[in-house]
């Protein structure tokens, strides 16, 4: 689910708590879902998705700011999301766990 792109894409959905809750409510039981939100919607949408058992995508592709007027780095955006996950007594997926969830092959180990 991508939310918050309504200013740039015709037919896109804005982010609101109610919209995300409704979209998740329409999924089949036991669905695995991921939420990505654009711009200022990124922090509230990803936090809500985590609380509702979803997966998230964060980074500069979707949001250039850490807070109002403060440019972000990918590292800052990822670190904040990891902090939120851990504050909720959850554990973020490792790169290999994420690959497994997505059905991706693990990179070849380098010799040496």
Predicted regions and their residues:
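Phosphate-binding loop/pocket of nucleotide- and phosphate-handling active sites
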Residues: 78-81
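Mid-to-C-terminal alpha-helical segments outside catalytic/metal-binding sites
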Residues: 83-112
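Short beta-alpha connecting loops at secondary-structure transitions
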Residues: 65-67
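Catalytic alpha/beta core domains of metabolic enzymes, predominantly
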Residues: 1-61, 71-72, 76, 91
